[in-house]
UniProtKB/Swiss-Prot annotation:
The lineage of its organism: Bacteria, Pseudomonadati, Pseudomonadota, Gammaproteobacteria, Lysobacterales. The gene is nuoI. This is NADH-quinone oxidoreductase subunit I. It catalyses: a quinone + NADH + 5 H(+)(in) = a quinol + NAD(+) + 4 H(+)(out). NDH-1 is composed of 14 different subunits. Subunits NuoA, H, J, K, L, M, N constitute the membrane sector of the complex. [4Fe-4S] cluster 2 binds at residues 73, 102, 105, 108.
Length: 162
């Protein structure tokens, strides 16, 4: 009996008709696709995008070269070199983030004791030449300077959850 039902199912191509029915059913349902350059999904308030280094209001950079972000990075994307200044404080001389390695987990932002490194809401960026994937300290500071008001507003809104 089992062979007979298998023969009729294969003769009538029921699997093929089932697949065609499924395709026909989804043809008339609303689409969930977003046409990306013209339309965009709303971003989460906690979206983690391109990194930035912040400064204090007096213009001094916040990073104290504690290297916690470098130590906590699971992808080993952060490289920091530091040196002592004349006044005895330690500051970074090199702060590089390899965006090809970075997994945007946010551990660097959470581990920073002075809120120096933050992840912005910049989603769209590109590289034209080899080596542009490594973002250095002046570039990170420029991003932070440009977006400081937005970063401060977002961190103030999220302060209750930290």
């Amino acid at each position: 009996m089992n062979k007979i039902t298998h023969y009729f199912k294969s003769l009538l191509l029921l699997e093929l008709l089932g697949g065609l029915w499924l395709t026909l059913k989804y043809t008339f349902k609303p689409k969930y696709t977003v046409l990306y350059p013209m339309e965009k999904f709303p971003q989460s308030p906690r979206f983690r995008g391109l990194h930035a280094l912040r400064r204090y209001p007096n213009g001094e950079e916040r990073c104290i070269a504690c290297k916690l972000c470098e130590a906590v990075c699971p992808a080993l994307a952060i490289t920091i070199d530091s040196a002592k200044r004349e006044d005895g404080t330690r500051r970074t001389t090199r702060y590089d983030i390899d965006l090809f390695k970075c997994i945007f987990c946010g551990f660097c932002e959470e581990s920073c004791p002075v809120d120096s490194i933050v992840e912005t809401h910049i989603l769209e960026y590109h590289f034209e030449k080899r080596g542009e994937n490594i973002v250095n300290k002046p570039q990170l500071l420029a991003i932070g300077d440009r977006l400081e008001t937005e970063i401060a507003e977002r961190r103030a809104a999220d302060a209750a959850f930290r």
